[in-house]
Amino acid sequence: GIGALGDIGCYSLDMVLNAIGYPKPLTVSGYKSDFFGKNPATYADRGHPEYADIFGVDDFAAAFVRLEGDIILDFRIAWAMNINTPGDTIILGTKAGLRIPSTNCWNGSVGGPMTIYHTVAGEQVETKIPIIETHDSYNIFDKKVRSFVEAVQNGGKAPVPSSQIFYNQAIIDGIMKSHRAGHEIEIKLPEC
Protein backbone atom coordinates (compact mmCIF):
# COMPACT_ATOMS: atom_id res chain seq x y z
CA GLY A 1 0.00 0.00 0.00
CA ILE A 2 0.83 3.65 0.04
CA GLY A 3 1.55 5.49 3.30
CA ALA A 4 3.89 8.43 3.88
CA LEU A 5 4.39 8.79 0.14
CA GLY A 6 0.72 9.49 -0.59
CA ASP A 7 -0.32 10.89 2.79
CA ILE A 8 2.28 13.62 3.31
CA GLY A 9 4.51 13.19 0.26
CA CYS A 10 1.99 14.77 -2.08
CA TYR A 11 2.20 18.06 -0.13
CA SER A 12 5.97 18.40 -0.07
CA LEU A 13 6.11 17.33 -3.72
CA ASP A 14 3.49 19.98 -4.57
CA MET A 15 5.48 22.66 -2.74
CA VAL A 16 8.69 22.08 -4.68
CA LEU A 17 6.92 21.56 -8.03
CA ASN A 18 5.05 24.84 -7.51
CA ALA A 19 8.32 26.62 -6.75
CA ILE A 20 9.80 25.50 -10.08
CA GLY A 21 6.72 26.01 -12.28
CA TYR A 22 5.29 22.47 -12.20
CA PRO A 23 7.31 20.95 -15.08
CA LYS A 24 6.14 17.73 -16.70
CA PRO A 25 7.65 14.57 -15.14
CA LEU A 26 9.56 12.32 -17.56
CA THR A 27 11.16 9.45 -15.60
CA VAL A 28 11.45 8.28 -12.00
CA SER A 29 13.66 5.90 -10.08
CA GLY A 30 11.89 5.21 -6.81
CA TYR A 31 12.25 3.27 -3.58
CA LYS A 32 9.97 2.75 -0.60
CA SER A 33 10.31 0.95 2.72
CA ASP A 34 8.06 -0.28 5.51
CA PHE A 35 10.88 -1.15 7.93
CA PHE A 36 9.54 0.71 10.98
CA GLY A 37 5.92 -0.26 10.41
CA LYS A 38 6.78 -3.97 10.06
CA ASN A 39 9.08 -3.96 13.11
CA PRO A 40 7.29 -5.19 16.29
CA ALA A 41 9.66 -3.05 18.39
CA THR A 42 8.01 0.04 16.90
CA TYR A 43 4.83 -0.79 18.82
CA ALA A 44 6.41 -2.18 22.01
CA ASP A 45 5.79 0.99 24.03
CA ARG A 46 2.11 0.82 23.05
CA GLY A 47 1.76 -2.81 24.04
CA HIS A 48 0.71 -3.92 20.56
CA PRO A 49 3.60 -5.63 18.75
CA GLU A 50 1.00 -7.49 16.65
CA TYR A 51 0.36 -4.24 14.75
CA ALA A 52 3.56 -5.00 12.80
CA ASP A 53 1.84 -8.02 11.23
CA ILE A 54 -0.96 -5.92 9.75
CA PHE A 55 1.06 -2.84 8.74
CA GLY A 56 0.71 -2.52 4.98
CA VAL A 57 2.01 0.86 3.85
CA ASP A 58 5.34 2.61 3.36
CA ASP A 59 6.92 4.65 6.13
CA PHE A 60 9.73 6.01 3.92
CA ALA A 61 10.08 6.72 0.21
CA ALA A 62 12.73 8.29 -2.00
CA ALA A 63 13.01 9.06 -5.70
CA PHE A 64 15.17 10.59 -8.38
CA VAL A 65 12.77 12.30 -10.79
CA ARG A 66 13.69 13.74 -14.19
CA LEU A 67 11.48 16.65 -15.24
CA GLU A 68 11.08 18.69 -18.42
CA GLY A 69 13.63 21.45 -18.83
CA ASP A 70 16.56 19.25 -17.74
CA ILE A 71 15.44 19.53 -14.11
CA ILE A 72 16.27 16.82 -11.57
CA LEU A 73 14.32 16.30 -8.34
CA ASP A 74 15.83 14.36 -5.43
CA PHE A 75 12.76 13.54 -3.32
CA ARG A 76 12.47 11.95 0.14
CA ILE A 77 9.54 11.57 2.53
CA ALA A 78 9.09 9.69 5.80
CA TRP A 79 6.89 9.52 8.84
CA ALA A 80 9.25 7.18 10.71
CA MET A 81 13.03 7.48 10.65
CA ASN A 82 16.08 7.59 12.89
CA ILE A 83 16.41 11.35 12.56
CA ASN A 84 14.12 14.28 13.36
CA THR A 85 13.45 15.30 9.74
CA PRO A 86 14.40 14.23 6.22
CA GLY A 87 15.68 17.81 5.87
CA ASP A 88 14.91 21.17 4.40
CA THR A 89 13.72 21.57 0.84
CA ILE A 90 16.64 22.78 -1.23
CA ILE A 91 16.34 24.06 -4.79
CA LEU A 92 19.67 24.45 -6.61
CA GLY A 93 19.44 26.57 -9.74
CA THR A 94 22.06 27.89 -12.13
CA LYS A 95 21.59 31.49 -10.90
CA ALA A 96 20.57 30.96 -7.27
CA GLY A 97 19.62 28.46 -4.62
CA LEU A 98 16.63 28.39 -2.27
CA ARG A 99 16.34 26.76 1.15
CA ILE A 100 12.84 26.18 2.54
CA PRO A 101 13.08 25.13 6.20
CA SER A 102 11.34 21.89 7.09
CA THR A 103 8.37 21.81 9.40
CA ASN A 104 7.44 19.17 11.97
CA CYS A 105 4.11 18.44 10.29
CA TRP A 106 3.00 19.62 6.87
CA ASN A 107 0.13 22.01 7.46
CA GLY A 108 0.57 24.35 4.54
CA SER A 109 3.30 26.34 6.23
CA VAL A 110 7.08 26.26 6.18
CA GLY A 111 9.44 25.90 9.15
CA GLY A 112 10.68 29.50 9.06
CA PRO A 113 11.91 32.20 6.70
CA MET A 114 13.22 30.94 3.37
CA THR A 115 16.72 31.86 2.21
CA ILE A 116 17.88 32.66 -1.32
CA TYR A 117 21.59 32.09 -1.98
CA HIS A 118 22.81 34.18 -4.91
CA THR A 119 25.50 36.51 -6.21
CA VAL A 120 25.13 40.28 -5.92
CA ALA A 121 27.88 42.55 -7.29
CA GLY A 122 30.22 39.57 -7.55
CA GLU A 123 29.70 38.47 -3.93
CA GLN A 124 27.83 35.43 -2.61
CA VAL A 125 24.97 36.63 -0.40
CA GLU A 126 22.08 35.16 1.53
CA THR A 127 18.72 36.90 1.33
CA LYS A 128 16.10 35.97 3.92
CA ILE A 129 12.50 35.92 2.74
CA PRO A 130 10.37 36.73 5.77
CA ILE A 131 7.14 34.92 6.46
CA ILE A 132 4.28 37.31 5.81
CA GLU A 133 2.18 37.59 8.92
CA THR A 134 -1.56 37.92 8.38
CA HIS A 135 -3.60 40.03 10.71
CA ASP A 136 -6.85 38.14 10.33
CA SER A 137 -8.06 34.92 11.91
CA TYR A 138 -7.55 32.84 8.76
CA ASN A 139 -4.58 30.57 8.24
CA ILE A 140 -3.26 29.43 4.86
CA PHE A 141 -5.47 26.31 4.88
CA ASP A 142 -8.59 28.43 5.52
CA LYS A 143 -7.64 30.71 2.63
CA LYS A 144 -7.14 27.77 0.27
CA VAL A 145 -10.57 26.37 1.16
CA ARG A 146 -12.09 29.84 0.72
CA SER A 147 -10.59 30.22 -2.78
CA PHE A 148 -12.03 26.84 -3.78
CA VAL A 149 -15.49 27.67 -2.39
CA GLU A 150 -15.49 31.04 -4.17
CA ALA A 151 -14.53 29.37 -7.47
CA VAL A 152 -17.45 26.94 -7.10
CA GLN A 153 -19.91 29.65 -6.06
CA ASN A 154 -18.91 32.03 -8.84
CA GLY A 155 -18.29 29.48 -11.59
CA GLY A 156 -14.61 30.42 -11.64
CA LYS A 157 -11.54 28.38 -12.44
CA ALA A 158 -10.27 25.87 -9.92
CA PRO A 159 -7.50 27.46 -7.82
CA VAL A 160 -5.32 24.40 -8.49
CA PRO A 161 -5.02 23.42 -12.16
CA SER A 162 -5.90 19.77 -12.79
CA SER A 163 -2.57 19.31 -14.60
CA GLN A 164 -0.74 19.95 -11.31
CA ILE A 165 -2.73 17.27 -9.50
CA PHE A 166 -2.17 14.93 -12.43
CA TYR A 167 1.62 15.47 -12.50
CA ASN A 168 1.89 15.13 -8.72
CA GLN A 169 0.01 11.85 -8.66
CA ALA A 170 1.86 10.54 -11.74
CA ILE A 171 5.15 11.03 -9.88
CA ILE A 172 3.85 9.26 -6.77
CA ASP A 173 2.49 6.41 -8.91
CA GLY A 174 5.81 6.31 -10.76
CA ILE A 175 7.72 5.96 -7.48
CA MET A 176 5.56 2.98 -6.55
CA LYS A 177 5.92 1.36 -10.00
CA SER A 178 9.67 1.97 -10.13
CA HIS A 179 10.10 0.43 -6.68
CA ARG A 180 8.21 -2.68 -7.77
CA ALA A 181 10.18 -2.90 -11.04
CA GLY A 182 13.53 -2.28 -9.36
CA HIS A 183 14.67 0.27 -11.95
CA GLU A 184 13.94 3.69 -13.43
CA ILE A 185 10.70 3.94 -15.39
CA GLU A 186 9.30 6.37 -17.92
CA ILE A 187 6.26 8.32 -16.79
CA LYS A 188 3.68 8.05 -19.56
CA LEU A 189 1.07 10.78 -19.47
CA PRO A 190 -1.92 11.17 -21.76
CA GLU A 191 -2.45 14.68 -23.10
CA CYS A 192 -4.46 16.81 -20.69
Regions found by a protein language model. Name each.
Residues 1-72, 78-84, 163:
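Rossmann-like dinucleotide-binding domain that binds NAD(P)(H)
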